[in-house]
Amino acid sequence: WSAATNTGNWSAATNTGNWSAATNTGNWSAATNTGDWSAATNTGDQSAATNTGNWSAATNTGDRSAATNTGKQSAATNTGNWSAATNTGDWSAATNTGKDGVAVSWGRRGKARGEKGCYLVLAEYDDSNNLVCAKMEKVDGERIKENTFYTLKNGEFAVAEEQGAGT
């Protein structure tokens, strides 16, 4: 039940326990969680928020930010430009709303969405959890729609059945 908060520039907030939260509101900040049920949030530019536990969320609202999750049922979200949202766990969702951003979801049931101009990177696995395909597409607003979660099916981008984050 820990919390670490920074409001100044060049700050770092870190949690290693469960049910934790790390928050930065200044520029050039980092917020990190390694426990389950954690949240790491940055609102400044050039920030990074990282979770390695299950049921986690990492969020950035500033430009040139990165949000990363490696646990199951996680969500990584960016609203600034030049941002990256990455998931490597199952049932994860990566969202990017900044122009020229990248949303990457490597989980078995991963999905990604973004604004027009963003790139989505997805992976597909077989029933034995072997990687079958990895693919990147640009959100063009026509073939790949804005603000729509996609997943890979048979090596092609397909609209995800569940549109909620982390489902």
Model-flagged regions — what are they?
Residues 81, 90-91, 97-102, 108-119:
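Glycine-anchored, exposed beta-strand/edge motif detector
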Residues 106, 110-167:
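Intrinsically disordered, low-complexity terminal regions
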